[in-house]
Amino acid sequence: MAENSEGLGTVPEHERILQEIESTDTACVGPTLRSVYDDQPNAHKKFMEKLDACIRNHDKEIEKMCNFHHQGFVDAITELLKVRTDAEKLKVQVTDTNRRFQDAGKEVIIQTEDIIRCRIQQRNITTVVENLQYAFPVLEMYSKLKEQMTAKRYYSALKTMEQLENVYFPRVSQYRFCQLMIENLPKLREDIKEISMSDLKDFLESIRKHSDKIGETAMKQAQQQKTFSVALQKQNNVKFGKNMYINDRIPEERKENELKQGFEEEDENEEEILTVQDLVDFSPVYRCLHIYSVLGDEETFENYYRKQRKKQARLVLQPQSNMHETVDGYRRYFTQIVGFFVVEDHILHVTQGLVTRAYTDELWNMALSKIIAVLRAHSSYCTDPDLVLELKNLIVIFADTLQGYGFPVNRLFDLLFEIRDQYNETLLKKWAGVFRDIFEEDNYSPIPIVNEEEYKAVISKFPFQDPDFEKQSFPKKFPMSQSVPHIYIQVKEFIYASLKFSESLHRSSTEIDDMLRKSTNLLLTRTLSSCLLNLIRKPHIGLTELVQIIINTTHLEQACKYLEDFITNITNISQETVHTTRLYGLSTFKDARHAAEGEIYTKLNQKIDEFVQLADYDWTMSEPDGRASGYLMDLINFLRSIFQVFTHLPGKVAQTACMSACQHLSTSLMQMLLDSELKQISMGAVQQFNLDVIQCELFASSEPVPGFQGDTLQLAFIDLRQLLDLFMVWDWSTYLADYGQPASKYLRVNPNTALTLLEKMKDTSKKNNIFAQFRKNDRDKQKLIETVVKQLRSLVNGMSQHT
């Protein structure tokens, strides 16, 4: 059973191997057969048996197939035997056809030989014709020359002439027509020279007309390149956290004016910028240069071209008389010059020898000297700072454009520093008007604020810092008036305006910082100081206004340090940098304060004089009124109110003003007594006058301004007091006895003053006692007066002799 089962398992395997042998390539049969021997023992015998059985099966199939196709094979052989007859007939026909083709070919050979003979004859005829017609190419070339002349192809015509002379004419020189052609060529050359020169003149006229457009295009390209570079620099600086105040324009809200608008008027949407080749056809120059080169007269052409261009340069450099009136006048002037030198630079690079670098440098140096002289002269007429600024921007773009073409422009930037001084002068004049307007519009009263918003609005304009003021509740008032923040803002605007000119001057931030500080110093020390002094001296400015002006200058002086920090910030200078220039605000505002203080003293004295002029004493009264004069009480009340306003002033200023007022009042009262037009004074008038002086002394002792020590202010009236005491007490014996002694009771009474007043009283006594002169008391008093007068005169005479 085991053997049977093993045999049953082997049979399918042998069948698989047989199928694989039948279906596999012969080269791969080896491994398959090897698997038979690798199997169980005696397996190959069984396989051989299986293989024999398979072969017998295939033999049977072959036999069946042969039996099936045998009849067809017999039929095919039979058909072949039938076709043999037809094949023999076909062979006969092919042989006949070949014979007939051979016969026909003989005729073709004969005809071909005839054709060859004809070709040989034709070639011989052509050779003869060519030998006879040597002149034809000459005529054709000459005809071509005429066509080239008609088509204005003069350079080609000259080349054709060279070919005729060098190649064609020698072949037919024996013919008369050739001699005529040879004689006509020089005339044609002269015609070409004249025509090309005419084209050159037209070209020169054309570029003169197109210089504006060429220069405008070149300057626009330079402006765009500069804008791109600035934007790139800005991007880099922003990336690395740097400020870009100078080259980026200061804050965004500041308007850019300036010239980009002038160059973008024509076609704002034009994406492709035209080049000089697009604007000007240079072919006439090239043709003329080539023609003169071919003619061997290149030097004549170069000399003529350079001479004409120098003439055009002089015309371009000649400005219009009213060029300084508008920026367009300057722009046309610059674009023409740029256009001229752009053309010369193009000619320099595309031609060889027509212009040289030495020639263009010489031409540029001549032009540069003329340009600087013209700009220096015309810019001096400019009074508008905006126009001067636009001129500066034009000069910068003009210089940058030509520098891009290789022309040195350092002298132009040196000129800009001269123009910068003029620009600052125009700015100073403009800001003088601005300051005057601010002062005229100011109400010279402290700025009132009622809420936090108003407080912040003022603080945003002016750097006011006072902790005590911040603690006060609303409503409250800033100590300064409206003009202070306005002036501070305008000083910053001036710095911005000055900085505008300093941009693009190829200077370091430190130099620009120094220039800004110098310009600001001029604004403070000259313009603002002058405006303040003029304001202080105006007749309508009263004491209250002068007090406010002093307060204002104090706060402006304190703000100068913030202006210095502001300049440092916008120029991006390190705080540690030692500045060679400082702001002179301290001296400027101190001088203004001194002037205002002096004006306060003057106006206060004038006001006192106005009150004193209202005095109406009855110098002959017998008895006083018992009360002070009305004018004097009004004057004292006025002084009290004024000195209350002075509480905001620095202590020394208020004290000086108060002392000056009291001294002036004392002097005015003394002059009133000693007036030469006043001839008589009664004792009653002296007593009334004494009541007024007492009120003055009471005013002085009331300390109208704090800070006086003891009776310092009352000493202003000491001369009057001692004089009036002398006359009212009639203490002449003491005065005369103690005169000249340091401890004298009447030390401040001058003998001349006492004599003058005593004579006025003596005359009054004579007049009043004309009928009572025989009274003993009156006679004694009169004698005493006369005696005192004599002694006083002796003292006065002694003083004069001693002097």
Curated annotation (Swiss-Prot):
The keyword Protein transport applies. GO terms for biological process: exocytosis; Golgi to plasma membrane transport; intracellular protein transport; vesicle tethering involved in exocytosis. It is found in: Cytoplasm; Cytoplasm, Perinuclear region; Cell projection, Growth cone; Midbody, Midbody ring. It comes from the Eukaryota. Keywords: Cell projection, Cytoplasm, Exocytosis, Protein transport, Transport. It holds the Pfam family Sec15_C. The keyword Isomerase does not apply. Signal peptide: none annotated. GO terms for cellular component: exocyst; Flemming body; growth cone; perinuclear region of cytoplasm. InterPro entries: EXOC6/Sec15 (IPR007225), EXOC6/Sec15_C (IPR046361), EXOC6/Sec15_C_dom1 (IPR042045), EXOC6_Sec15_N (IPR048359), EXOC6PINT-1/Sec15/Tip20_C_dom2 (IPR042044). The exocyst complex is composed of EXOC1, EXOC2, EXOC3, EXOC4, EXOC5, EXOC6, EXOC7 and EXOC8. Interacts with CNTRL. Interacts with RAB11A in a GTP-dependent manner. Belongs to the SEC15 family. Component of the exocyst complex involved in the docking of exocytic vesicles with fusion sites on the plasma membrane. Together with RAB11A, RAB3IP, RAB8A, PARD3, PRKCI, ANXA2, CDC42 and DNMBP promotes transcytosis of PODXL to the apical membrane initiation sites (AMIS), apical surface formation and lumenogenesis. This is Exocyst complex component 6. The lineage of its organism: Eukaryota, Metazoa, Chordata, Craniata, Vertebrata.
